[in-house]
Design a protein with these regions (language model features):
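A late C-terminal transmembrane helix in Major Facilitator Superfamily
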Residues: 320-351
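Structural signature of the two symmetry-related core transmembrane helices
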Residues: 74-88, 266-281, 362
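Loop-to-transmembrane helix entry/capping segments in MFS-fold secondary transporters
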Residues: 42-43, 127-137, 234-235, 318-330
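C-terminal membrane-cytosol helix-exit motif in multi-pass small-molecule transporters
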Residues: 167-186, 371-375
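Helix-to-loop junctions at the C-terminal end of transmembrane segments
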Residues: 59-71, 156, 251-263, 349-350
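Helix-loop boundary and gating motifs at the non-cytosolic
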Residues: 6-53, 216-226, 237
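Paired small-residue
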Residues: 97-105, 290-298
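Intracellular juxtamembrane helix-capping segments at the cytosolic ends
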Residues: 112-125, 305-318
Length: 387
């Protein structure tokens, strides 16, 4: 592929993924706050938010076979059609059980767009620029998220109009991707062993899991956590997600630049430490506006940096036919985190109070940090014994 076509295809994917970020930014706070107005508990709201992650876990084991049978663009076009239709049905059916089903369908469609976009980004990016390109990719998702949250905060929740706006943007996002071509010579390895990837690359797959857990929990439940601090103002509580996303926009660019120059294992440890400390302090300082914005910025940035650094390592370690299966495994573990994050943190908030939002996630982050350091120490010892 010529350099011109490579850059053109990269630009198409980056534009589309920015619009997908807008869709996420509208749907996440809008869905949580809509259910809250129905009188739904935080744990059930979290469970509803986890439906998209559950869909990803269900579909990813079959993803490689589907690509080989229907082609990359066959899968992509199907997902681009289903996504806006499912979103548009949300305000029509005000039934929690139907919402579970619709969010599951949205998750299936979003997974196809998401996974193929990541495969294309990693396949099109050159190694010497991989960290920066993936950082740009993740930052553009966050930029879209900020725009989406701001759009959501301007539309009254009671009207359901935000969902129709989101569906319209989903249609627009299909335009740059619709005429993409399959990557040449890209049959995919169909035997995806998630256990093998977990054992051989625990730090890499663990980074996707912790990112999914923290990202989904904060995006879904931050507006609920924020309500008592903003006098139950729904618009203000939804805007807190924009501050979270601003960190997700800026910090990965810096981390991606560092990832091309410095030791990635140390970077992962530093990121983990920052996330644990800021999450632990968050409930204590949240009623101070300036500190609230600062800490949300840092929390969001550290969470998205798990993703940026993990995806950079993935593209560096896996090439060719195994790239799609490795990427599917990466998203599988991320989605396991997404499934667990909202309902588990929501249940902690129901049991232990609102402040459990930050403290419980800090404990989970600390456990991951210990596992990551231990697994890398074991790996280094094994390599030294071989020498």
């Amino acid at each position: 592929m010529s350099n011109k076509n490579r850059l053109k295809n990269l630009a198409k994917v980056l534009l589309a993924i920015t619009l997908v970020g807008v869709i996420i930014g509208i749907n996440l706070p809008l869905s949580s706050l809509t259910l809250q107005t129905w009188g739904i508990s935080a744990s059930v709201i979290g469970f509803a938010a986890s439906m998209t992650g559950l869909a990803t876990v269900v579909i990813t084991p079959f993803f490689s076979k589907l690509i080989n049978r229907f082609g990359q663009m066959g899968i992509m076009r199907f997902c681009l059609v289903v996504l806006p239709i499912a979103i548009a049905f949300l305000p029509i059916f005000q039934n929690i059980y139907l919402w579970f089903l619709l969010r599951f369908i949205i998750g299936v469609a979003a997974t196809g767009v998401w996974l193929l976009s990541e495969v294309w980004i990693n396949a099109l990016a050159e190694d010497q620029h991989r960290g920066k390109i993936i950082a740009l990719y993740s930052s553009l998702i966050s930029l879209g998220l900020i725009v989406g949250v701001l759009i959501s905060s301007l539309i009254p929740i009671e009207t359901g109009g935000g969902f129709f706006v989101s569906a319209g943007i989903a249609i627009i996002s299909a335009i740059p991707l619709w005429n993409m071509e399959d990557l040449p010579d890209f049959d995919v390895v169909e035997d995806i062993s998630f256990y093998r990837y977990m054992v051989t690359a625990p730090g890499l797959m663990g980074s996707s899991w912790i990112m999914g857990f923290l990202y989904a929990a904060t995006a879904a439940l931050l507006p609920i956590f924020a309500l008592p601090f903003v006098e139950n103002d729904y618009a203000q509580s939804s805007r807190t997600v924009a501050w979270l996303a601003s960190g997700e926009l800026v910090m990965p660019l810096f981390v991606g630049w560092l990832a091309d120059r410095y030791d990635k294992t140390r970077l992962m440890i530093y990121i983990s430490c920052v996330s644990v400390i800021t999450l632990a302090i968050l409930p204590v300082i949240f009623d101070i506006a300036v500190m609230r914005f600062l800490f949300l910025f840092i929390v969001g940035g550290s969470i998205m940096s798990f993703y940026t650094l993990g995806l950079t390592l993935l593209g560096q370690e896996y090439k060719g036919k195994v790239l799609a299966s490795a990427n599917a495994s990466f998203i599988f573990f991320l989605s396991l985190g997404e499934i667990l994050g909202p309902p588990v943190v929501g249940a902690a908030m129901d049991l232990f109070g609102n402040n459990a939002f930050g403290w419980f996630m800090a404990i989970i982050g600390l456990i991951y940090l210990i596992i990551f350091i231990g697994s890398n120490a074991a790996g280094n010892l094994k390599r030294s014994n071989k020498i």
